[in-house]
Swiss-Prot record:
Transmembrane segment boundaries: 12-32, 62-82, 107-127, 189-209, 223-243, 292-312
Role this protein plays: Mitochondrial glutamate/H(+) symporter. Responsible for the transport of glutamate from the cytosol into the mitochondrial matrix with the concomitant import of a proton. Plays a role in the control of glucose-stimulated insulin secretion.
Protein name as annotated: Mitochondrial glutamate carrier 1
Family annotation (PANTHER family): MITOCHONDRIAL 2-OXODICARBOXYLATE CARRIER 1-RELATED (PTHR45678), MITOCHONDRIAL GLUTAMATE CARRIER 1 (PTHR45678:SF3)
UniProt similarity note: Belongs to the mitochondrial carrier (TC 2.A.29) family.
Source species of the chain: Homo sapiens (Human)
Localization (cell): Mitochondrion inner membrane
Domain of life per record: Eukaryota
Keywords: Disease variant, Epilepsy, Membrane, Mitochondrion, Mitochondrion inner membrane, Repeat, Symport, Transmembrane, Transmembrane helix, Transport
Transport in keyword set: yes
Example GO BP: regulation of insulin secretion
Recorded GO CC terms: mitochondrial inner membrane; mitochondrion
GO molecular function ontology, one term from the record: L-glutamate transmembrane transporter activity
Membrane topology: Multi-pass membrane protein
Amino acid sequence: MADKQISLPAKLINGGIAGLIGVTCVFPIDLAKTRLQNQQNGQRVYTSMSDCLIKTVRSEGYFGMYRGAAVNLTLVTPEKAIKLAANDFFRHQLSKDGQKLTLLKEMLAGCGAGTCQVIVTTPMEMLKIQLQDAGRIAAQRKILAAQGQLSAQGGAQPSVEAPAAPRPTATQLTRDLLRSRGIAGLYKGLGATLLRDVPFSVVYFPLFANLNQLGRPASEEKSPFYVSFLAGCVAGSAAAVAVNPCDVVKTRLQSLQRGVNEDTYSGILDCARKILRHEGPSAFLKGAYCRALVIAPLFGIAQVVYFLGIAESLLGLLQDPQA
């Protein structure tokens, strides 16, 4: 991508279009990932991704799977635009006379892109997680209350589905956080977000660039769109699984509400220690399957939109209406 000069407006539009399409397609899986990652040892509301989605639809309706989607759809455009544009910018700055970047320079470009995007990613994830996890917490409390009543009555436990949870809004959450904690409230978990997104970009962008290059026919200037899509999917899923332990820690730290008897954390190291001590090493892979399913098409779509140059075509039509 270093040899392909694209205007900044086109980069921003391409990133925004890709983000909107991707989030709309995979958001329910992202909701399942958040709820599974936040489950600690003890009362488990969901046993798997499919179980989570089924119970969510039964108790909260179809649109319950899209709780928090409005936040993502609003902020994913600047987030993805910053990420893709920053990576392209750093690759261009690090390249010399259009020569292929070394692996180290590709990793540095990815590191720069991951660092830039957290400006938007951290508050977006902070709000989204509260909205996504509200149903899980309400469901857990309902089940525990039902178990307590049955124990007192000596009865057998029935199947209890998740209830309709209170519905906080992103506006309400933002107002409460700003009032109680200031701007720092929206950036809770910033360190953990950097710990996830910088390594992700360091893995993703070099891997994508090399996979995309391998699939490019020698006679063509750029790879076919399906090669870009597959390269984005493979690189995205590989990077997502690689940094999933950091994502688990970030999700736990950014969750403001806790279920019954769930641990609280004072920081990244405290969170990692408690997860390892109380839940074992496998807990760091919670939601990894969901995250791979989310990231693969998300970045596959992003790269297809980016490499097809949809924004360039739109801008060209606007500049030359007779074309």
